[in-house]
Amino acid sequence: DAQESRGLGDVYKRQGWRMHKEKPHATTGKPAVPNVYVKSATLWGGNLAVLASLVGTPYFPQVKGGVLFVEDVHEHPYRVERMLTQLLHAGVLAQQKAVVLGQFTNFKLAPHDKGYKLQSVVDWLRSQIKAPVLTNLPFGHVETKVLLPVGATVSLSVEERDALIYCCLLYTSPSPRDS
């Protein structure tokens, strides 16, 4: 066959990336939308502070209908909310089919934080956009990470607390004429 999967083991070819609720992988927590299926979306994103700083510049990726993933480190929940608000008001979040939040780690609560937690940010975000918001995907500044094929076309399936991201990386073998 001229087209075949590249870089994925047999299990991943058949099942996609399965992230189970028993492991601290991409779960919806308390799902805003219990069952969702997103088809043919560009997977893109990265560090939230970097993306927020690029809004309004020619360097900000112009992805519509994508699956946006973001994470950060050493950022308090109110700062995460501020950066997501910037993406919201720039129209970025409304153009996505899904938003996947990574693990926001290594911030220290201060006395003035008054208990404002990341879950409050997640609840607020879910109230602001129509796209499903998934949480706790292990990527970025965490010890155990999943591989995310940035720029690949993916499908996303959410059933209750389980989320699956499917990706098919295809290549064409060079023809003898190309050699």
Residue ranges and their predicted role:
Residues 35-36, 43, 60-62, 92-93, ...:
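Solvent-exposed alpha-helices and their adjacent loops that cap or buttress functional pockets
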Residues 1-12, 171-179:
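Single conserved hydrophobic/aromatic residue that forms the stacking wall/gate
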Residues 42, 48-50, 54, 64-67:
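Active-site rim beta-loop-alpha module in soluble metabolic enzymes
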Residues 103-170:
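ATP/nucleoside-binding phosphotransfer catalytic cores, i.e., glycine-rich phosphate-binding loops
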